[in-house]
């Protein structure tokens, strides 16, 4: 479930809901989890659908890249994305969770061809800040980010366990994103939420229940960066897809972009022709 809002009018803010998670922490659990060795992740990877028609990919891209499921200030049907390097900083005293998050960021960077994303050494150097909190501190953290009144509205309408929001400029370029994740709900859910929230903070903010293969479906849990969503993010971050584009403008360039994206996703995942 996703909420998009303008508050104040110059601020584009979207709040995404997902079932979130985190763990109790054994020394090498972060390495194991990020390597896809959790049984819940491994079983999903074995059963994953990896072959899609052009129309299946395009449908999912258009549904997730435009608009948002829940709005406070109307619909905005324009492409929103970062137009430069993305640097992520994690604020937490949980070294295991920070290690997992860094591996998630590295995985995203490996699989999205034209996205320059990496961890930052400080909050000041980051344009994506990830706050890792205990579940009992979530509402207080939301209040510190968005104010008590907005936090109550979020809790009443969405009852989130994790969320993210971004600020864009007048050209629909994302300037800054905030992600809030809880750390004490289990490994699988932590990774599931970390992937979805980080990816949605990059632009594809619309959850949809009509596309069964995407993690941007509230009925789907992944825990890893699946092939279908790699198509969506690679389409979004192709240089020919520009911030501020309308649906019609995107459709005009999609065929050529999709040809190149298919070749990249096939290569990086070692998929058969």
Please place each PLM-identified region on the residue numbering:
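Bacterial N-terminal signal peptides that target proteins for export
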Residues: 3-16
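Disordered inhibitory propeptide/activation segment of secreted metzincin zinc metalloprotease zymogens
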Residues: 29-86, 160-169, 270
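Metzincin-family zinc-dependent endopeptidase catalytic domain
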Residues: 99-195, 200-211
């Amino acid at each position: 479930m996703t909420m998009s809002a303008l508050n104040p009018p110059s601020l584009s803010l979207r709040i995404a809901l997902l079932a979130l998670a985190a763990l109790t922490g054994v020394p090498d659990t972060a390495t194991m989890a990020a390597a896809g060795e959790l049984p819940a992740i491994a079983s999903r990877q074995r059963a994953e659908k990896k072959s899609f028609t052009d129309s299946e990919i395009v449908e999912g891209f258009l549904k997730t890249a435009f608009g948002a499921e829940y709005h406070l200030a109307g619909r905005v049907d324009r492409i929103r994305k970062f137009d430069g390097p993305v640097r992520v900083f994690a604020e937490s005293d949980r070294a295991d969770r920070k290690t997992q998050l860094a591996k998630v960021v590295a995985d995203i960077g490996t699989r999205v061809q034209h996205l320059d994303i990496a961890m930052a050494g400080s909050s000041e150097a980051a344009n994506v800040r990830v706050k890792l909190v205990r579940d009992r501190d979530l509402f207080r953290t939301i209040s510190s980010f968005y104010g008590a009144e907005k936090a109550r509205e979020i809790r009443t309408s969405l009852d989130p366990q994790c969320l993210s929001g971004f600020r864009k400029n007048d050209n629909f370029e994302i300037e800054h994103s905030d992600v809030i994740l809880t750390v004490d709900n289990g490994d699988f859910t932590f990774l599931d939420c970390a992937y979805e929230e980080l990816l949605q903070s990059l632009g594809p903010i619309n959850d949809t229940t009509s596309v069964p293969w995407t993690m941007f479906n509230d009925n789907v849990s992944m825990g890893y960066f699946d092939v279908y969503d790699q198509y969506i993010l690679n389409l979004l971050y192709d240089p020919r897809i520009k911030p501020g584009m309308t649906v019609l403008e995107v459709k005009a360039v999609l065929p050529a972009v999709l040809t190149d994206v298919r070749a990249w996703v096939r290569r990086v995942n070692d998929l058969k022709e």
